[in-house]
Every structure is written in C-alpha cells, then in structure tokens.
Regions:
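RNA-binding accessory domains that recognize and position tRNA/RNA substrates
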Residues: 2-201, 213-222, 229-259, 263, ...
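Residue-level detector of beta-strand face positions
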Residues: 23-24, 62, 334-336, 377
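Residue-level structural signal for beta-strand termini and adjacent loop
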Residues: 36-37, 75, 349, 380, ...
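Catalytic beta-strand/loop cores that center a nucleophilic Ser/Cys/Thr
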Residues: 342-383
C-alpha cells in the first residue's frame, strides 16, 4: 500500500492508500488521495491554486471563490485557526481546500475555532497530505481542471460516480454566479476599520469587521461618514474589506443586490457608483448587469470597479473578456502603473481577463500585469469611470493600492 501522507495526482483507484479518507477525483480518472477534514461529502468545481502564505480564512470566505477548490501552495495552512473578525462574507464560499501538511490545532490568541472544525461547520471539505506542488504544476501545464473533492471518514468512495460527476460539470464559462452570492436586500454599511488590542503592547490598526469577542474594539477608527459622498455599491459577490475602505476614505455606503435596476439604483441618490468583485463568467453576469452599467455611465456619476466590476465596465463600453489559462490568485502579484511606471504589489483572484484588443478609443489602459502582460486596469477618457482587475482592499495582501479608494471618493467631492 502507498503512504497516505503524500500522494501523487497520477494515482488510480487501485492505489488507494490504507487509511485515506479524502480523494480529489479528476474527470479523466486520475485520483489524488489524502486525509479528509471538515465536512464529509463530495463537491464538484474548478481546481485553482493560491500562493498567499497567510489569509486563508479571508480566501475561503471570498465570494469570488464560489464553485472553486483552492489548493494552497504554502505548506502550513490552518495553524492559527479562525476567528470571528476576519470573514470577507458571512460564510465560506470556496467549495473546499487542499493543503500539504495536516492541519494542527489553533495557535493564536484571537482564534475562536480550529480550522478543521470551522470548515466542517461551514459545510466545506478539506484535504491534507496531497502534493500541492504537483497540483500547481498540473494547473499551470493543463489549465484549471474540473475536480470532485470528497471526504468520507470510512474511506469508502464510489470513484466511478465521482468521476462521472466531474465529467458532467459544465465549467465556469457561461456560468453566472453573482446572483447566487449577492445579498438579497439593500444594506447601509457602517463599519470602518477597527483597532485590535494586542495582548502586550500598543493597539494596531487592522481591517476587521469588529464582530468578534471582547479582544476587538467595537468602535471603528473612522466612523461611518454622515456627510460624506454617498456611494451606491452593486454587490456581485463583494468582500467586506472593500466597504470598510470606502468608509475609511470618507464615503457613506449603500449596498444593492447584483440584480438592482437602474431606477432602483438612482432612487438612492448616489454621488458615485461602485461595481464589486464576484465569481463566475463576466459575460454571463453581464447579460443583466451591462445594460444597467451603460445607463449609469450616461449619468456621468463617478464609477469605480474592482475585479468582476472591472470586467463588467469593460463589457459595458464594448470590450471583451476571456477565460485565462490558469488565472491569477495570490497576494504578491506585481502590476505596473502605465502612467508613471510605478510597480504595485497586489492581491489578485480572477480566472477571466479583459482583452485589450477591441477596447474603444475612449478607454485608456492604466495597469498591466508584470507576470503575463494582461490588462489590470482601465479608465474612460469621456466619463469619470475607472476600474482595476486586482484587489486594492487586499485582505489578504499588500496595501500598495489603497489610494484608489481615496481617488474615487475625491472624484465625488
């Protein structure tokens, strides 16, 4: 029998190691075995990899990861547990995760749960003991495959059924997921960044929701602006830290569902429009979002888009998007600002990109990936509108690009 601790992605059913309780099943019959943790069951989606060393809780709760299984390239994931503050949404949205080393117990004073227990409570499946380097190389070589991630405590798997499940999944192209992850009701956002009391030493400013235990201060550093510019944000799968940064920049924020109509949006008397990040194929979401965005552009209100919002803005002005071969997901992606050549280290999470070919003359490219030269930002020359493909709010990741929130709020003043 093979060792259950670390297994190859090339193994087949006959190679199941003794004691293996987790399986990653590919449509072509390949199987990677490991130890399951979190929820039991099986889920089908697209395999991707994420290169951040920290921030796994934020990654797992980012709605942009809907219908995806995340393989973390850093070997030690889950060791500090999870807490009640660092969620980017109320629940996990990634289908599951794959880690190299077995998840240990929580070792941070802010932790309220072990990572494995938290995954189980959120109905998400985890696998440990897989060769995550081999998985990453597979995605880079073949593109993101459809997989079924499965955890059975008794080690009994119907591999033919799991393979058929993987083979029958249609993939992310053509899939609108924004409706699935968007909030359904209008929400007035009031939380800014918070002060965290460290055990010994001065307080430190962190991007927290402030919904945790007594060790987190409940009052935001920057209270919700009462007289500041009013941003109406369209939630296609937004991360909470985006709204915290809008508030810190001095804006009042009202959040509307992804399917909000033009009339519903302007009824809130916005000073500016924000288009959020989100999962799925932008062309599919654009079927209902793009006509609304085009109407909003005609108002000449300032408009700012991030990630999916960037792609939707490009579609609204006549551009095209396409699925990337492997996508960009990590917290250390260098991006060049075209205007002055400055390099920003950014956080990214996208599997689709804007094609610069076909963009109209009224669109100026503002940012470019230094990894592959793909488009990472644009602005309109005839409207007060701009967008970026990456995540300036980070969480996790660097804060090189927080100036974009100040730029947006400044355009509304």
């Amino acid at each position: 029998m093979a060792d259950a601790r670390t297994t190859s992605v090339e193994q087949r059913a006959k190679d199941q190691p003794r004691g293996a309780t987790g399986a990653l099943v590919f449509a072509d019959g390949r199987v990677a075995w490991g130890q399951g943790f979190g929820a039991e069951g099986a889920a089908v989606g697209e395999l991707c990899f994420h290169t951040a060393m920290t921030g796994y809780q934020e990654v797992m709760t980012d709605p942009s990861f809907a219908k995806q299984v995340v393989a973390f390239t850093f070997p030690h994931i889950g060791n500090v547990g999870t807490n009640d503050d660092d969620h980017e949404a109320s629940d996990p949205h990634a289908l599951g995760c794959i880690v190299r080393e077995v998840v240990t117990g929580a070792s941070n004073y802010r932790s309220t749960s072990d990572f494995a227990d938290w995954m189980g409570a959120g109905g998400r499946i985890g696998l440990s003991g897989l060769d995550t380097r081999a998985l990453t190389q597979l995605v880079r070589r073949e593109g993101p495959p459809t997989v079924v991630i499965a955890h059975m405590a008794n080690g009994e798997f119907d591999l033919e059924a799991l393979r058929a499940q993987a083979k029958g999944w249609p993939g992310l192209e053509g899939m609108d997921l924004a409706k699935e992850v968007s909030r359904e009701q209008v929400e007035n956002w009031s939380g800014g960044k918070h002060v965290l009391d460290l055990p010994e030493g001065p307080s430190t400013t962190l991007g927290m929701s402030g919904e945790g235990d007594a060790r987190s201060q409940k009052e935001p550093i920057i209270p919700s602006a009462v007289e500041g510019p009013h941003v109406v944000a369209i939630d296609y799968g937004a991360k909470r830290n985006i709204f915290r940064n809008l508030v810190e920049a001095g804006a009042r924020v009202t959040i509307l569902p992804a399917t909000a109509t033009y009339d519903e949006i302007v009824a809130h008397a916005p000073d500016g429009i924000f288009l959020s990040n989100g999962p799925g194929d932008p062309a599919a979401t654009g079927e209902y979002a793009v006509p609304v965005i085009r109407q909003l552009l005609e108002t000449k209100l300032p408009l700012f888009g991030i990630c999916l919002g960037h792609q939707l803005l490009a579609l609204a002005v006549g551009g095209r998007t396409a699925k990337m071969f492997q996508g960009h997901r990590g917290a250390n992606h260098p991006v060049k600002r075209v205007l002055d050549g400055r390099v920003e280290i950014t956080s990214m999470n996208h599997g689709f990109a804007v094609e610069r070919e076909g963009l109209p003359a009224t669109v100026r490219e503002t940012h470019v990936s230094l990894f592959d030269g793909s488009n990472c930002g644009l602005e309109l020359t005839d409207r007060p509108a701009f967008s970026v493909q990456y995540h300036p709010e980070a969480s996790p990741g660097p804060m090189d690009s927080l100036y974009l929130f100040e730029k947006f709020v400044g355009m509304m003043r």
